[in-house]
Amino acid sequence: MSVKIHIDRGGTFTDAIATFADESRPPIVIKLLSEDPSNYKDASIEAVRRILEIVQGKSIPRTEKLDTSCINHLRCGTTVATNALLERKGERCAFITTKGFKDGLLIGNQSRPNIFELGIRRPEVLYSKVIEVDERVTLEDYVEDPMKVKTTIDGSDPSLVVGRSGEVVRIMKKVDCDALRKDLQALYDEGFTSIAVCLAHSFTFPDHELLVGKIAEEVGFSNISLSTKLMPMIKYVPRATSATADAYLSPVVRRYLAGFQSGFLHGLKTKDNSKGVRCEFMQSDGGLVDVNKFSGLHAILSGPAGGVVGFALTSYDEDVKIPVIGFDMGGTSTDVSRYGGSYEHVFETTTAGVTIQSPQLDINTVAAGGGSRLFWKNGLFVVGPESAGAHPGPVCYRKGGYLTVTDANLLLGRLLPESFPKIFGPNEDESLDVESTRKEFEKLTAEINSGLEKERQMTADEVAFGFIKIANETMARPIRALTEAKGHDISIHRLTSFGGAGGQHCAAIAKSLGITQVLVHKYSSILSAYGMALADVVSEVQEPSSFTLDDSNTESIKKRFDSLKEEAKANLEEQGFTESQISYELFLNCRYQGTDSTLMISKPLESWDFKQSFFDKHKQEFGFIFENKDIIIDDIRIRASGKSFQSKEPSVDAQLKELKFEPVQKSLATCVKDIYFEGGRVPSEVYSLDNLPVGTIVNGPSLIVDKTQTIVVPPKAVARILHTHVVIDISHGNEYTANDSLAKASTIDPIYLSVFGSRFMAVAEQMGRALQKTSVSTNVKERLDYSCALFDAKGNLVANAPHMPVHLGSMSTCVRTQAKIHEGKLKPGDVLVTNHPSYGGTHLPDITTITPHFEGDEIMFYVAARAHHADIGGILPGSMPSSSKELSEEGATIKSEKLVVDGVFQEERMIDLLYNEPAKVEGGSGSRCLRDNLNDLKAQVSANQKGINLITSLIKEYGKNSVLRYMKAIQENAESAVRQLLLGVRERFLGEDLYAEDHMDDGSKICLRITIDEENGDAIFDFTGTTEEIYGNINAPEAVTYSAIIYCLRVLISENIPLNQGCLLPIKVIIPDNCFLKPSETAAVVGGNVLTSQRITDTILKAFQACAASQGDTNNLTFGIGGKDPETGEVKPGFGYYETICGGSGAIDGLDGTSGVHTHMTNTRITDLEVLERRYPVILRKFIIRENSGGAGKYKGGDGVIRDIEFRIPVTLSILSERRAYHPYGMKGGKDAECGKNIWIRKDILPSGEQRVRQINVGGKNTCHMQAGDHIVIMTPGGGGYGPPSERVDTVKKANGVQHFRANGTISQLQEIQHTN
């Protein structure tokens, strides 16, 4: 008898399902612990052994090697690679890279993971040592060339070659093979056996990398991970980190596979050592691969990928085509994914803190699961992200654990102890402990009630239910994000629940999302293993391209596909598939010229019209298309599938259509339990799923249980039993419209305070996604340089998605100012626009649109969207000149205008303001991208309307008075948290005032005295003594100071409090008129937003003695050509580039500073070296840590960086930087850090014809005219040290314990980009 075995080895449990060719024979299901060393060495082998015992009807000793003669195939998923990555237990490996980039992966994209964490905790690199190869290539042409010159190769210059992408590559320096061999031999002699290799531009020119690999193989390295073979895609950093991940993980995976194979007779081979039984492993992309081809890089999401395949192929009907959301809720986290007829892949993700460039299913892990811990913090219910883990686990596990979501479900009657095996307690022989859970909830309830008024006292049931509501909201938000980010309407989806804990939450989450139907498969708790049975064996092949997508290139593209198809076919034929069993999917990875947003476009079934498919997908995801913009093909990809032999089960829709349904017989209920739902406990029938006939209808409230899952059917919901699924239909009645009960309650409900806090924040987040979707500029659409927020009727901030620290306090200043100006003058259909620093703006490129929402004649609330526009005129492209002295030189100024009047967009007025007015300034120009300005402003208006619609829906759900009441309450909650902080600070400082001062490089002084009231925690932040307005551009609008204050308060509280106006309610700010923190209306301010904001932050933190100074700077570098000629007025075509450069962070008590990272008020990413050189005529010669530039101390300050850029053509360059004169200060005996330097390496030709190289310090702020061959070398400041150096202990230097979730797909990408601006 031939058996097919499918195994998912998870973190806690290993699941297995065995099926037979005779489909009348029921499958065998096995569930066992993944780790049980006292009983077995390997859980997967043990699962096979138990299955074979059942199949063969005989006992098989654990010591006996397993005979595979009756096995048709083995298919496995494993967390071995994931766990090694999460726990940092991979192979010791070395990294081989191009000279000048030894710290490239340490710096990464220069952003920090958490913008509100003073002690920056960045994941450590995976390699143990770096070797630099003295070689270099670059791309000869550059994309932004206004003349569009294309180099052709005629053989006259042997250093020019054509790369795999079709681009011309210049070989500047070849590999010195003798020196490399010597270095690699020394490395090998140190004991290294695994290396990762990534050289600059090897995605298109692999020759040097292949040579390194050849020499390494000759030296004797057993594992050589070449980035060009793993994933030949542009972007050095993610490709390099992918190579190091493979070098780190593949030896671990191979050892595991060798151990696995050794458990079988002849090691899964025949007696004559030829290939034996088929054995395949699941890869991160949802495809299977032969056991001997399974590698570390592609194993990271092996288990979760099986779950996606499982739910996709069991829940989606190809005829009905209803898309499905996968909801996989486990113990520590929840995985969210989507399927709409094809697998959705991402090609650059961050997994376990490591950026991976490899095809992975778009799986998004949320820090909420059954084991998520429950907290009462600052008057709010908080779920996670901390987890109780398996040990000690939840309280009910009887191991002295913590209160968790599982405990809440148990207390409320949603889990039945009798349905669980007796595996708990110290001897693992007891049932779940309800009584201990109840006692712990009663303790927590007493703590909560101690801070509540008598009439608002809560029961333990209410507290537990409150945590369930918060957990559900936490999990619902990323599901909204996943669908909306791709332009889908969430309400037309189904929700498919799987995983051990999903059944208790899926109906409530569906209701929250507006989803009407939930599917729960009969194998939902082992769906990842079941997915292995349904999956195909896959071979993915791709290569880079630089083709333009047009008819002239179609034949060339077809030839490239043919070549890739042969390679993919050969891979699958080697694994035993015949040509008739192989199918192919063809893809082009495309983007518009000048953008980074790529879309993976599949070939239409009946044509080669990729262009129309690109238009359709771009329109869906982003809301628009460019008719006349070139479409660039970055990659050509083939996915070849060897088709699975498993027959598909009947679809849900077919069963719903064919079956006749009847109400359940009450006699089938095993018991009746009092289960808590909204409002109280309700008698609810409990049914065993095994006893429910197909075609049965079960009304809620009820529980449906089997051996591995519990499904909650809430009141008004209806469950239907199919052959393969339980289908739950959700009622969507409005519970609060009639009585507005929350508003009538005499006190604030802390549960709904937490719910509303989350929902208000979700409004701001969804506004942001709407803005990103409908905008057209790179700044907004790709860098996500924007903020969206919700305000009450007075203009007070209610919720601001915390992506841009410099916007946190300033947007409320802006809205309050505009509300006052237009008081009584606004009407429905009006939208305001402003960017002026004296009216709540930060700098001119940040334009804010404000929309009021009316009820009758009364404004109920405002929404606002602020976006950074790439250019709004002024004396230099980018509207950020380093030499501006007056505001008018920096571009268009808009004090207060109506952008929309009675629903009509005022386009002519905006053209006048953005284009005509700035051009009247001497040396100035109107906006250089007016069309983008207008389109992005319309996108901002649309985002505001999205916010109004969402709040209107919230009002419909909970009632107007409740929403308005909780808008106020959430501000009061933040106010309370800040007051508690300030009272604690006053006590620490023994009632003394806090004082600090700092200096800008021109000597201008920032003075701050903080006085805290001992009674109520009120505080005065008094900046008296600060220098007068500056004749330059480091003046900071008043709103910037408010942003710095709210940012500092948030990091000092160090907990996730609501960010709103309440944070500033205890604060009185005194800023003298006409000082450079409150300049006049015409003062230049561009440096205030990007430089002075950092120094205000340093000064505040210095007063609190919280942190040594960080680099106090953002190192703004711009260069370009073209624009308006100041002498002739002629506008010449050109380009412009802008970047900010990281430095060192200041040390804090207990923690070293971090090197090469952005701090405080900025968190922008830096352009990848390969993208930089492809787009612009530059060579990045060096980007390394500036060693020992951080201040010494008990805790050392972080080091700055050195960034060396060589120019290949003449350009105009501007630098706007600080801390070139005043050192970043140390604290509590810690030493100051090194100042920064900006060095121009200039090549002058003397009259004699000789070349002289000069090194010129250009100072902190300057404009230089660089010639071809000149370099700019930016050496950024470090961070100050903390504590006396004599007390340093080297064992306590770095932050550890960063929480990494296993899968970070689309949602994480959006959050990362937006948190890095």
From Swiss-Prot:
Disulphide bridges: none
Pfam families tied to this protein: Hydant_A_C, Hydant_A_N, Hydantoinase_A, Hydantoinase_B
Gene Ontology biological process terms in this record: cellular detoxification; glutathione metabolic process
CC annotations in GO: cytosol
GO MF terms held by the record: 5-oxoprolinase (ATP-hydrolyzing) activity
Top-rank lineage group of the source organism: Eukaryota
InterPro entries xrefs: ACX-like_C (IPR049517), Hydant_A_N (IPR008040), Hydantoinase_A (IPR002821), Hydantoinase_B (IPR003692), Oxoprolinase-like (IPR045079)
UniProt-listed PANTHER family: 5-OXOPROLINASE (PTHR11365:SF2), 5-OXOPROLINASE RELATED (PTHR11365)
Family the UniProt entry places it in: Belongs to the oxoprolinase family.
Protein name: Uncharacterized protein C11D3.15
